[in-house]
Amino acid sequence: MSKKLIRFDWAIKRLLRNKANFVVLEGFLSELLYDNIRIKKILESESNQETDDDKFNRVDILTENSKNELIIIEIQNTYEIDYFHRMTYGVSKSISENLSIGQAYENVKKVISVNIVYFDLGQGKDYIYQGKTEFKGLHEKDILELSHRQKAKFLKENVSDIFPEYYLLKVNNFTGNAKDTLDEWIYFLKNSEVQQGSKAKGLKEAEQVLDIMQLEKDDQYSYNRHLDNLSLKASEMISLQEEAEFRVKVNRDIENAVNGINEGFDNLTISKITKLSIEQIEKLRTDLEK
C-alpha cells in the first residue's frame, strides 16, 4: 500500500524551494508540458511577498526548456470564486515584475501559468485544461501568424508562443487510476500518494522528499496547521453551498405560493404544495394586496 505524503500545495512553498529538491518540480513540469524542464531559480518577486495569502499560494519559477527558452512558471493553489481573475492578475504581475524599466518589449518572457485547484471551478468535465491566445479573423476565419522576420528575430513559430499560456488542473475531477505519466502526477496531487508502478519523472524523488516522517518538528506543526486550515475552508464552502441551496428552495417555494394565490388556491392547499406555513402564506397575501 502506498504511503501518504506531504500535500504538494504545502511542499511547493516550503520543501520544494530548496535547490536540492528541484528535481521534483522539474519532473512535474516536464510531464505537464511534454518538455525537458530545468529550474534556474525561484523568483523572489514582489507578488510573492505582498500578502500572506500571495506568499502562501503562489510561487514564480524561472525555468529553461529544451529550446533554451527562459519561461516563468506560476503555480497557484487557493479557494476563490474569482480564481479566473486571480490567474489574470498573477500573470500580469509576473510579466511586469520581470521586465526592467527601459527594456524593449521583445524581452518580455513567456509566462506559463500552472494552476492547481481543489474546488469546483467553472463548468467542465475534464481535469486538465489548456488555454492560449490566438487571433482569428472575423471574416476569413484564418489564424494570424508571425511574419518570417518575426520568426527569425524572436525564434518563435506562432503568435501564441509569445502570449501567456494557462494550464488548469481540476484534480478533484480525476477519477480512477492513472493511464499515463501525467495522470500519475494528477493522482499524486489528488491523493498525496504515489500510485504503485508509477514511472513519471520526479515521483520517485517525491516519495523521499515528501515523506511526512522526515519533517522537522516545527515543519510538522506548520503542516498540521495547514491541514486544519484546509478542513476549515472545506467546511466553510460546504456551509455556503448549503445556505445557497436553501435560499434557492425558499425562493422557489415563495414563487410557487404566489402563483397559487394568483390562481385562487386556498392557504391549506398552497401550504401542502410549498411546505410554507399558513402564517407565511397569509403574509404573502397581505404583501400582494398592497
Predicted feature residues:
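A short, ordered amphipathic alpha-helix with a cationic face
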Residues: 1-2, 15, 174-175, 196-197, ...
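Short, well-ordered beta-strand micro-motif
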Residues: 115, 168-170, 211
